[in-house]
Each structure stands twice: as structure tokens, then as C-alpha cells.
Amino acid sequence: GIKLFCNLKNIPKYFKKSFAKVKFCQFSELEKILFHTYNKKFIIDKNSCSLFFEKIILKKNSILNISDPIYHMKAIKSKNAIRNIEKAHIDDGVALTKYLFWIKNNFIKKRITEISGSNKLLQLRKKNKKFKFLSFPTISGTGPNGAIIHYKATKKTNRKLKKGDIYLVDSGGQYEFGTT
């Protein structure tokens, strides 16, 4: 039979009933179930399956490597989806442009820090009535902090933007019609 591993809290009952032949399992059970599965064929996409799970499967089972068709279908966008993606990037680009203009004009006058800069960018995004929330936590790092992967400024690590330092801001917005 088919087993689908997922976060069961996110699967409505009506959805489970629609797929009567599928056994829905909690994702956290995957490793344990794989260790106790023998002489089965698994279809996986080696481009997206973790090496950890692939090795567990191969100990007692065989694998058929098939490219995930959903992965490729996600790459195909309708004209409406493309328009919405473009609109989201244009609207978010307006906020980012205003932010960079604000930094340029206030760099010397005000004490701009990683945190105050991140807050200002959020404030500018919120001026758009279609803005919902951040796509992911904003990464706002200057100097050595700008080189830290997934850096999150705190009161302790918060640095002032200084002339000569590189400033990295990685951010995105979720709008009614799309995300950046």
C-alpha cells in the first residue's frame, strides 16, 4: 500500500477520506518504519530524497529512481501566476527602493542599525495594503555579521551601519497575490 508521511495536523479528515487507499502517517514515524521495512521497492527522487533516508532504504530494500513530476509541474506557471509574481516583485521592489533611498538619505543623520533598518523595511512594506507578512525573517547584517548564514540580529549582536562596511539585507514579502 501507499504511505504518505506528513504533518497529520495539516491534513483535513475530508482529504483523508478522498484517498482511502493511502495510509497517512506522521512524518516523525518515517525513520522507524523504514528500519522495519524489508524487501520492498521504493520510488524516490534522488534529487530531493535525503541521503540519510536513501541509505536506510537501501540496507533492506531496492530503489527505483524516478524524477518527481510535481517538482517539474511547479516550474510551469499560468499567465495569471506569472502576472501575480511580477506584481509581487514590483510592489516589493517599490518598498525596497524606498528603503535604500531612506538609508542613503539618513545614513549620516541617523543611527541606523541592523534592527532599526529591518524594522524600517517592514514599515515600508506595510504601507502597501496588499502586504500580508514577511516571507521569511529578514536577514539584516553589516560588517562581519553580513557573512553569517541566516543571521538574525539581536540586542547583543546589533551593529550600526558604518561607512566602508558591506550591508546585507535578504528579505521577502507575502502579498495577497504572490510572494518574493
Predicted features along the sequence, with ranges:
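Active-site neighborhoods and metal-handling regions in enzymes and metal-associated proteins
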Residues: G1-T180
